[in-house]
A protein has these predicted regions:
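ABC-family P-loop ATPase nucleotide-binding domain
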Residues: 1-10, 298-308
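ABC transporter nucleotide-binding domains
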Residues: 2-6, 11-205, 211
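Short secondary-structure transition/capping segments
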Residues: 30, 42-43, 57, 234-237, ...
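An acidic, carboxylate-rich microenvironment
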Residues: 57, 72-75, 97, 217, ...
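A generic structural signal for secondary-structure junctions
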Residues: 63, 81, 103, 107, ...
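ABC transporter nucleotide-binding domain
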Residues: 170-258
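Short, charged/small-residue-rich alpha-helical element at the C-terminal edge
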Residues: 224-298, 308
């Protein structure tokens, strides 16, 4: 049984449809990234899964129960964790006090010292929340989400405000949680975060899912053309090259192919045979950001690569 199952989900506010015919599943132990621009329907969808908002149509199961069913909502909320973009935490409590209080709301919480260690606030455990930096407060937010030892964790922009080191630490924490069986639903605008963490991705735009798959396959990434670029060697002409050239501007050769290994083999073999240097050789693939922007902004136009 999947941790989350959504079938033909719909939500309307009067004449406005916030979510339209959305379907997906999240397998236990996976990290599932739900992406989309502001206003696409992400927050509404997540709040329905959490049981904080009613749906207009469709079927939803979270940890095997209907989150809209009042009789199971208390049970569900003791088995899920939620990390919002902004949390209101008592500024005059210490980190340890806040976590200890919240741990008391759950039947089988994770030990508070373990949580403090996981979120990297051991040196700040007895400091008041108001003295924490923005990044440290964000770590505390994550701690509050995991102190209940949840089976399912909802993370909304978990690394916003963190420096690069803090982001990597948070990623490591998420990986550790999933290795222990925790399922994670992630919303983020950082595509590198998606590629680092997610097993599956779905992109919402204008209330509908416009694409779903793995980070490496969504939008045809795994079958798209690769662009190979290098400077034409001194003494060589385009006609000397063993492959078809798509463009040549100011000495920069550009070749597009779906068979990059064969082409690179031919190209490097030719260069070695003639003692040429392939200066500036680069292989440019379609990025997840390229695909995301195409799906959410200019889906009627050909996908353009961000790399130059």
């Amino acid at each position: 049984m999947p941790a989350v199952s959504v079938r033909h989900l719909a939500k309307s506010y009067g004449d406005k449809q916030a979510v339209r015919d959305v379907s997906f599943e999240v397998e236990k132990g996976d990290v599932f990234a739900l992406l989309g621009p502001n206003g696409a329907g992400k927050t509404t969808t997540i709040e329905i899964l959490e049981g904080f908002r009613d749906r207009s149509g469709g079927e939803v199961e979270t940890l095997g129960v209907d989150p809209a069913e009042r009789s199971t909502q208390r049970w569900l909320r003791t088995r899920m964790g939620v990390v919002l973009q902004e949390l209101a935490v008592e500024p005059y409590y210490s980190v340890r006090q806040v976590l200890t209080r919240n741990a008391g709301y759950y039947p089988s919480p994770r030990p508070v010292p373990e949580v403090i260690e996981l979120i990297g606030l051991k040196e700040k455990a007895d400091d008041r929340v108001k003295t924490l930096s923005g990044g440290q407060q964000r770590r505390l937010d994550v701690g509050l989400g995991i102190v209940g030892n949840p089976e399912l964790l909802f993370l909304d922009e978990p690394t916003t405000g963190l420096d690069p080191s803090g982001r990597r630490d948070t990623w490591d924490l998420i990986r550790q949680l999933t290795s222990l069986g925790t399922t994670v639903m992630l919303t983020t605008h950082y595509m590198d975060e998606v590629e680092a963490l997610a097993n599956r991705v779905a992109v919402l735009n204008n209330a509908e899912i416009v694409a779903a798959g793995t980070p490496t396959s969504i939008g045809g990434r795994d079958s798209s053309e690769v662009t190979i670029r290098f400077l034409l060697p001194d003494g060589a002409t385009v006609s000397d090259l063993p492959v078809t050239v798509h463009s040549l501007e100011q000495g920069l050769v550009e070749i597009r192919t779906r068979d990059e290994l064969r082409l690179l083999h031919e190209l490097t073999g030719w260069a070695l045979e003639h003692d040429y240097a392939l200066t500036g050789l680069s292989v440019v693939r379609l990025t997840l950001e390229d695909v995301y922007l195409h799906l959410t902004r200019d889906a009627d136009e050909p996908i353009e690569r961000s790399a130059k």
